[in-house]
C-alpha cells in the first residue's frame, strides 16, 4: 500500500515536468523563429544601405573627377592667357600684343615704288608709235568680230532684197557701233598726236636724236608674231565669199529637170482612159 501510495505522486510530478519542458521548448522555438525573422530584416536593411552608400560613393567620385578636370582646364586657359597677354613690370598694367601695321607698310611701299619707277612722258615718239600700233590692231579686231557676228544673222534671216547701192559681188560688212566709235577714237588720237608733235618738236629734238641711235620699239611691236598671225587670219577671212554672193548664186540657180517627162506627168489619151487598146482619135472631117 505504501509503495503504491509513493508511486502515484511521483508519476504526477514527472508528468508535470514533461509538460513544462515541452512548453518551454515551444516557447524557445517561437522565439527562435522571431529572432530569425528579425535577423533577415536587419540583413536586408543593411544590404539596402550598402547599395545606397555605393551609389553616393560613385557620385562623389564623379564630382571629384569633374572638379579636377575643370580646375585643370582653367589652369591651362590661364597659362595661355598669360602667354598672350604681357605685363609691364613697373606698373603692372596689361597691354595687348602690338599688331603689325599693314596699312602703313602698304602706303610706304607704294610711295617707294612710285618714286623709283619713272613715268614715261606723253610726248615720247616711241610711246606714240606703240599706241598707234595697238589702236590699229584693236580696230582690225573689232572689224573681224563685227564681220563674224553679221554673217550668221544674215543666214538666219535670209533677206530677199539686197541693200540699195551695194554690189552683191563685193564683200560687204555692216559696221557696228563699237567700230564707228573705234574709228572716231583713232582719228581723234591721230589729230591730237599730230598737234602734240608739232608743239613739242623743238623741245624734243635731243630726245629724237637719242631715240634714232637706239632701236625703236614700234618695229618690234609691228613685227611681232602675234600681229603677223592676226593679219594673216584677217586676210584669209577677207578672201572667203560673202553671204550676199552665196545668196545671189542660190537665187540664180535652176533645178535640172529630166528631158523625158516622168510617167506621172504624161498626158493620157481617151482610149487609154476608157480601156480601149487600139483606139485612135478621129481626124478632122471624119465622123464616128
UniProtKB/Swiss-Prot annotation:
| Coiled-coil region | 16-69
What Pfam families does the annotation carry? CC190
**Region (Disordered), start-end ranges:** 141-235
Q: What does the UniProt keyword field contain?
A: Coiled coil
Q: What is this protein called?
A: Coiled-coil domain-containing protein 190
Compositional bias of type Basic and acidic residues: which residue ranges? Answer: 177-188
- Biased region (Polar residues) positions are 203-213
The record lists the organism as Mus musculus
Q: Where is the signal peptide?
A: none
Amino acid at each position: 500500500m505504501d509503495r503504491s501510495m509513493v508511486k502515484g505522486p511521483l508519476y504526477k510530478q514527472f508528468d508535470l515536468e514533461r509538460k513544462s519542458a515541452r512548453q518551454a521548448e515551444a516557447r524557445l522555438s517561437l522565439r527562435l523563429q522571431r529572432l530569425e525573422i528579425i535577423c533577415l530584416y536587419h540583413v536586408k536593411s543593411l544590404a539596402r544601405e550598402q547599395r545606397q552608400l555605393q551609389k553616393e560613393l560613385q557620385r562623389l567620385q564623379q564630382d571629384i573627377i569633374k572638379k579636377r578636370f575643370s580646375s585643370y582646364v582653367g589652369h591651362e586657359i590661364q597659362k595661355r592667357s598669360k602667354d598672350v597677354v604681357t605685363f609691364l613690370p613697373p606698373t603692372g598694367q596689361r597691354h595687348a600684343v602690338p599688331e603689325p601695321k599693314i596699312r602703313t607698310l602698304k602706303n610706304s611701299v607704294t610711295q617707294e615704288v612710285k618714286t623709283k619707277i619713272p613715268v614715261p612722258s606723253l610726248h615720247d615718239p616711241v610711246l606714240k608709235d606703240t599706241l598707234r600700233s595697238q589702236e590699229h590692231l584693236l580696230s582690225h579686231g573689232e572689224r573681224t568680230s563685227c564681220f563674224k557676228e553679221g554673217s550668221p544673222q544674215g543666214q538666219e534671216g535670209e533677206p530677199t532684197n539686197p541693200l540699195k547701192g551695194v554690189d552683191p559681188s563685193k564683200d560687204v560688212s555692216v559696221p557696228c557701233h563699237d567700230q564707228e566709235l573705234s574709228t572716231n577714237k583713232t582719228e581723234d588720237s591721230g589729230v591730237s598726236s599730230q598737234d602734240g608733235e608739232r608743239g613739242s618738236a623743238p623741245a624734243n629734238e635731243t630726245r629724237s636724236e637719242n631715240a634714232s641711235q637706239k632701236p625703236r620699239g614700234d618695229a618690234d611691236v609691228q613685227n611681232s608674231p602675234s600681229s603677223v598671225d592676226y593679219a594673216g587670219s584677217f586676210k584669209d577671212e577677207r578672201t572667203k565669199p560673202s553671204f550676199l554672193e552665196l545668196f545671189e548664186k542660190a537665187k540664180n540657180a535652176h533645178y535640172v529637170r529630166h528631158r523625158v517627162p516622168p510617167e506621172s506627168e504624161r498626158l493620157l489619151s481617151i482610149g487609154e482612159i476608157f480601156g480601149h487598146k487600139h483606139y485612135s482619135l478621129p481626124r478632122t472631117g471624119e465622123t464616128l
